[in-house]
Amino acid sequence: VLPLRLEELTVAGRGRWEVRGEKLSVRLSGVDPAPAYGDRVVGMGQLRRPAVPWNPGEFDFAAYLRRLGFSGELEVDGRTGRWERRSSGHGTWLMASALRMREWIGEAVTFDIGDDPERAATVRAMVLGTREKTPPEVEAAFVGSGTMHVFAVSGLHVGMFAVILWNVLRLFGLRRGLVVALTLPLVFFYVYITGLRASAWRAALMAAVVMAGPLWNREGNLLNGLGGAALVLLAVQPAYLFQPGFTLSFGVLLALALLHRPVLRLLAPLHEPDPFLPKELYTARQEAWFWLRRRVAESLSISVASTLGSAPLMIGYFRMVTPVGLVANLVLVVLSLCILVVACMAMAAAALQWPLLTASLNHANWLLAAAGIGSAKFFAAVPGGHFRVDPSRLWRGSVCEVTVLALDQGGSAIHVDTPSGRHWLIDCGGRRHFRRSVQPHLEMAAVNRLAGMVLTHGDSDHAGAAELVRGAFGAGRVLGGDGGEELRAGSAHELDEGVVLRVLFPPEGWEAGVADDRCAVFMLEVHGVRVLLLGDAGFPAEKHLSETGVDLRSDVMVKGWHGSDHSGLPETLAASGARVVVVHRSHFPPSEDPPPGWQRRIAECGMQEVDLGRSGAVVLRLRPGGVELSGFADGSRLVLPSTGSVGVTVTGIAGRVE
């Protein structure tokens, strides 16, 4: 993926468009060598709007590109389309220099440790902020330990880099003005080569105020510096206001400014010496002990204040609370500082062309990176050290939310969030769906652990991600699938109080050669509302249900498509009586396209269709009074009052027939 500033655009059948200066995000494949910064190129490809998220929790790439000023997305395949480099050297000198320096630093700080990708990627991420080659489990460990700001370049790293430069230059006896004049350009250049992050800009601007202020007899003030940095950044780029990095960075610093001293006063018993012992009588050992206690208390107060400041924002953005970060930051911030110091020494050795010293320093950083990864994994594994919370539970009431995810190519996953907060997953999609859709949705839904997972049948697009789901979210019970509890028609499973999942199909002893013919069919009953989950059941299953008189009455039907047979039979639709049917229309694969006559059948039954391909994920909110359906992508909304037609079994004494 690379940004492209347009000079000319010609659209097939529409001629040339006036687009000079507009930016496109280009996805390249089959192009070797890849274009470099400043190349003038001519290409042919598919121009489109960036895809919007279809499921809750998915990354909104379209909004991200809009904030960065991109007008659209271009996909180019060099094997079938045209991609030609005309000339080079058309970029700015500053950006070209920054990119060359970034590449040189990446090679210098990982010299001789590249055979360990995990540690090398960690060092590179902490020094340069590049996370492309970082294993997902390493990132997850830093997120779970509440130390992600330590892992990726942030305002913390810029501040540490400024302190390192300041102290090194002061060792040479230079005057303050000269030290400031040398330090600040290097600090801003570091911000430039590490990606121009809002938090890094904030730290650089505040460092400039703190360092340069005394030259004009001005004392630094944290709140003034914070406000000034915010004013400058928002004046240059107002879109920063909508970036989590910006609000988290400024929110944490604001909390530090307001809460650090009050928290330190509360910790006074931990660090203040005996007031009746004169300082003149301190021994060297006591002085060292009091100094250490003071530093620990200050570090702890900073950690507490920053955690309190970031907690509301972390809940709002990521549904995450990390109390273990109070302690983890004390360890990992020190390790991060050590890694940055050693990396600066390695860069100096590489610049002097001392490969042996460079390799030795990088091996020291390898050990520090290993300690950092190990510490992050240890703190992330502490029970209760991090957990997800959903603030909407404070006001949503006794609602059962059923989210039917919109997954491509026949994938299926349905998330059931019961009134008391128990989470169940009915099918889990394929492996390709997990990181893109299923995992982000469950994280945004504040799932700490699944109460259970139900696997309807052995289709890789329905159950392929089962192991990934279990590894990330656990599962108290597993119904269906290999090693799970058997799904048998007539059985009922209570997912929560008042939330029942009844198995309608398959019956005991059912034999079928195709996986879709063994697909389980369920009736979900909540608050008197019934949702029929037909899955990929086809002709044999639907015929069996209609011939055996199984009660299919429901308010909403959720239906997939059989991979090779007819489904959606008229008798099934009529027996259901559902007012809404949720399906996913797709032209690929062909089996995911509705069969001929489908629209006529549902019209004859008075059903309204909700297409996941248009609405995105559909959220069903089941209440005692009925069900509300809302589309995630298109914002559609439909409210159905409950019919109250719930199948029951009664026992009593018959009276006289009138």
Predicted features along the sequence, with ranges:
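Divalent metal-coordination and catalytic microenvironments
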Residues: 45, 126, 154, 195, ...
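Active-site environment of divalent metal-dependent phosphoester hydrolases
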Residues: 158, 198-200, 432-433, 458-464, ...
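Hydrophobic alpha-helical transmembrane segments in multi-pass membrane proteins
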Residues: 74, 134-325, 366, 370, ...
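Cap/insert and terminal regions of metallo-dependent hydrolase folds
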Residues: 358, 542-617
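Membrane-interface helix/helix-cap signal primarily in integral membrane proteins
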Residues: 1-149, 389, 436-440, 449, ...
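Transmembrane helix-bundle segments that form internal channels/tunnels in multi-pass membrane proteins
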Residues: 83, 168-178, 254-407, 413-422, ...
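Di-metal (Zn2+ and/or Mg2+/Mn2+) metal-binding site signature of metallo-dependent hydrolases
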Residues: 147-172, 448-473, 534, 560-571
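Core dinuclear metal-dependent hydrolase active-site scaffold
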Residues: 131, 234-235, 242, 376-452, ...
